[in-house]
Every structure is written in structure tokens, then in C-alpha cells.
Amino acid sequence: MQNRNKGITLVALIITIVVMLILVAVSVNVIIKSNLIGTAEKTVNKYKTASEEEANGGVIEIDGKKYNSIEDYMAGKEKLPDIKAGERATANSNYKGAVIPKGFTVSGISTEQDVDNGLVIYDIPEGTTPDWSNPDSVKTKYNQFVWIPVEVKSSDTEDSIASFYRSEWTTNASTGGERTTGLSTDYTEPDSTNDTVDKTGIADQITELTKSIYKYGGFYIGRYEAGSTKERTSSSLQTEPFVVQQDKYPYNYVKWGKSMSDVSEGAVYLSNNLYASTNTNYGATSMLCTGASWDSMLDFIKDSSHSVTDGTTWGNYGDSETYTINRGKYAVYNTSNNTLENFQDVVNEYPKEKGKSILLTTGATERNCSKNIYDVAGNCWEWTTESVSS
């Protein structure tokens, strides 16, 4: 994830489905405040009816909501309405087992519709008709996110998911790397592993993220590095909104926060505000990528052609073999004076030579992509919620 200029880009952000969790919490409060005996009697009758429905191989229905099983009902995992490719979700919906948050559209591009190969959703305004036959016209205009499946076992809980963890990696050429449970204790998620007051809100966000993954079986991550419509400099504001779109300047020269306890600007602030919890137009909220989310994403995209322990064969590094860039812009890093030159348009194609360091606009080449996620290897360093201290 290296970038030779002095900036650091935002990590691809996480979309967590938390709206339904809030609604469930409200329902629980209502039940607690009502007649407990009457509620218990009604629950028994509902459970009996649901058991009969499940035994008959059908979807069960309780209080007007549908569930695939009684276990799903107990876990609050409501059956979501199905949605088609190219369709915009007016409520949290299901597409091939992935949750499509309210306000987002399933890609209408055939190579972006498979969960195992990177399902893509777009933030396309209501009433807009995208031209799916011209992919670049859509990729450069709307924010995009990719679904990262996470295995949830019956032994997991909403507070702890065995397959969702921060990890180290060992080399394995045939698989692209092996994920291990070992991890340096130098890195922590701020205020989530000690007794200090959580001044950033990240500990609570991680709690909600884990609950969401337990309920829905995954999360979304930005398809591209955070982008800017204009070149950034060391004097650029730390509160300017970013986008997650193709052919944008990397959102570099950005701090993690004002300090480790003040996130009123910088990467954490920007990520939180892309899809804030107060925005009821969406069935999702955003946050800066956590360490566990980053490693889960790596586990999803790795294969024999995309190593997560040596990205020189598919990433943008100075020592990467020569490869071709066929869209967007590039800026050459001048090693003689340690400066980044101005961005230049790619005309037809540009050969990135081994030994030359360059910075690319987002999604500049398919070579640097795995499962529809771009520029994970090289181009820029990425921020996560991890830190070396609290």
C-alpha cells in the first residue's frame, strides 16, 4: 500500500447495516414496557404457528415479518425482499445472499453481479437511469462498494465472530497468502482494548459492525481508494468530502484525526460523514475500515494471482514489473528531489516501467484489481482504525 509522496489516502470505507438493528432495539423496549404475561402468551402462540410453518417447509411469519427459520427469528434475522440486478433498493433487500442497503443499486454490469467474484453496488440517485452499456459512464459518476462475505457459524455470537479478526499473514504462492491468528500487540483499535474513555466512538462502531456482520453475513468496502475531484496538497482541508469512484485523484495529504482522541477532522471524520447515521435516505452507515475488516477483505480477494504478502505482480510499486495503464492520470515521483510531479493524462496507454514510482488516479488499470476492488496493493498507504497507541 505504499506511496512515495508525502500523503496518505483514506482506506476504503465500510458500509455497516445498522438501521435494522436500531429498529429491533426499539421493538424490544416496547415489549418490556407492555403486559409481560399477555406478551408471553402471544409469543407462545406465534412460536407454535411458526413451528408448524417451518415444519411444512415454508417461510415463517411473525408480527407481519418473514423469517427463514425460528432460529433466524430469535436472532432478529428478518427475511429480506429479493431485488434484481440493476434495481435500486427502496428498503434493505436481498440479492443472491448479500444485503443491498436501502438507497443503493445492484450493478447492471454482468461482471459485477456475482458474490464470489465481487458484487458491486452503486449509490445512484432515485429517478436516475444509468447507462449500464457504457460502464465508464457509471463508474466515474457514482460511489461504489463491494460486498465482503464473512463466515458466521452457529457457535458465533453478535459480540464475537471467529472468522472476523485482525491477523498477520504468511507467504503461500498457491493461495496468495495464509491468514494467521498471530498479531503484534503494538497495534490496537483505539480505546477498544483498554479501560480508557472512548473519545473517538470507534469502540462502539466496532461493536455495531460486529453485530451487523453477525446478522447479515458480511459488510461493504469501498471499491476504490477514497478520491478527490481535484489534486490535493499539504495545505488541503481535512474536512473536504471524498468520493469512491473511478478516475479520481487519490485523497492523500490527510491525517487520521486531529489527535488520537480528537476526530473532528481527518480520515475518521470523513469516513463517518460519508453516510452518517442521521441520513435516513440510506439503510447503511459508514466508518473508517477496521483492522479486522481490512484483513477479511484481503482474505476475500487473495488467490494465486493476487498475493497479499507480495503485491508487486499486481500492485503499483516502484519495483513492479513494467505494465500498461490505459485510463485516468499518472504523476511521476521524482526520486532525485523527493517530489511528486504534476498529474498527466494517459493518452491511449502509458507503460509504467520497473524502477519508476508513480501515483495513479483511482482504478487506472484492471491489472491492479482483484474481485472488483482496485489499488489495494500499492499506490497509497491506507488508514485503518488501528493505531500504535490509544
Regions found by a protein language model. Name each.
Residues 30-53:
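Aliphatic-rich helix starts adjacent to a transmembrane/signal segment
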Residues 381-382:
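Generic structural signal for well-ordered beta-strand positions
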Residues 69-149, 153-158, 286:
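GGW-centered surface loops in extracellular recognition modules
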Residues 135-142, 173-376:
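Short aromatic-cysteine micro-motif
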Residues 6-28:
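N-terminal single-pass transmembrane signal-anchor helix
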Residues 28, 151-155, 224-228, 293, ...:
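Acidic glycine-/aspartate-rich tracts in secreted/extracellular proteins
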Residues 51-68:
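Short extracytoplasmic
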Residues 154-163, 228-234:
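Short, solvent-exposed loop/turn elements at domain surfaces
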